[in-house]
C-alpha cells in the first residue's frame, strides 16, 4: 500500500487524511505545512520516493528499507526537532500509540474518572500533542474535536462540543491558559473540562498561581514525541497545595536517573527515528532531573541547548548556521531566555554591525517563526565566564539595557 505524506493547512482536513490513511494500513508521514525551505528540504530527503504528498508540492527523495512499505503498514511517522532546519520523524505504530492512550486512561480511572476519553485539541495535528487527543478518543470509544488554539483577545472562546458522559480532556500549553484567563469567561470555560493536560515548557509562576487559586483541574504533564506525548503527570491537588512539580509515571512507565540525566522505560516509546537509530531501552531523554524514591520525576532542564518556545523545540545550532552563512557575523551564540508568554524566547548574541540587523532578520525567514530570534544583542565579543563558557547572565544584562 502506497505511503502518504500529509501537509494540509486545514486541521480537520489534515486529521481526516491521517486517520483515513492509517485505517487503510498506509504508512503516514505527518508534515508541518508551516515548515520553511530548510525544513521542507530535510523532510523531502527522508520521505521515501513514491510517497503521495497531500497539501503542498513536495518531491520525496528518501530511500527506504527493503521491507518498505509492507513492514511499516500501521506506522505513523511524527515529526520532531523540525524547528531550526533539521527534521526527524519518530516511528510510532498502533501498539505504541495504543499503549500511550490506555496508560493515560488507566491512570485517570485510578482517580475515579471515566475510562471514555473525550479530547479537545488546540494544537496543530502534526504535533504529537495535537494528534494524541484524537487517538486517545479513538482507542477508548470517546469523541474529539479540533479547535483554534490562538485564543485571540478579540474573539470569543470556542464552543466545545463533546458528550456529557466520559472524561472531557483539554490539551493546552501555558501560553494558551494565560490567554484564556485574560478572557472574561475564561475561568468558567476552563472549568468545563474534567482534565486539563498542561504540557510544553516550564510553567511560569503566574500560571501556577492561577491554577492554585482557582483550583483548576490542571495536570502538569511531562512527555515528548518519542513517548507519544505525556508519560507522567503531576495531579491538580499537588499543584493546589504548592508541592514541588513532580511527574508521577503512567502505568507501565518507569523513570531511571543516570548521572543526573533522565531515561524512560515505557511501552509507548517509539521504535526509533526514521532512517536513523533505534531507540534504546530505557530511552535517554536529554533532560536533567531527579527520580524520587516513589518513582516520580523532577525535571530540571535540558542537558543540551534545546530551547522550548511555545511548545516548539528549537535547535540553536541550526539558527547559528543560518546566520553565519550570511557572512555578516564574526561570532554568534543563540540561547533562550525566560518569557512569560512563550516559556522561552530565542535570542541571538552576535559579533556583527547593528547596521546589518535587517539583513540578519531577513536571513532567518527560511526558518519557522518559532526559530527566528526575537531579540539580537550586538557585541564586540561574545561574553565568556571564567571557565571560557558563554556567560548567560552577562548576555541577559545586555539584553535589559
Question: Where are the language model's segments positioned?
Answer:
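Conserved adenylation A10 loop of the ANL superfamily
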Residues: 74-89, 108
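Conserved pre-ATP/AMP-binding loop-to-beta segment of ANL
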Residues: 62-79, 111-119
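Conserved ATP/PPi-binding loop(s) of AMP-dependent carboxylate-activating enzymes
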Residues: 248-252, 258-283, 296, 302, ...
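AMP-binding/adenylate-forming catalytic domain of the ANL superfamily
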Residues: 368-390
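ATP-dependent adenylate-forming carboxylate-activation enzymes
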Residues: 8-9, 28-43, 142-164, 314-319
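Gly/Ser/Thr-rich phosphate-binding loop
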Residues: 182-240
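AMP-binding/adenylate-forming
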Residues: 45-53, 89-110, 114-179, 195, ...
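AMP-binding/adenylate-forming catalytic core of the ANL superfamily
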Residues: 266, 281, 288-371
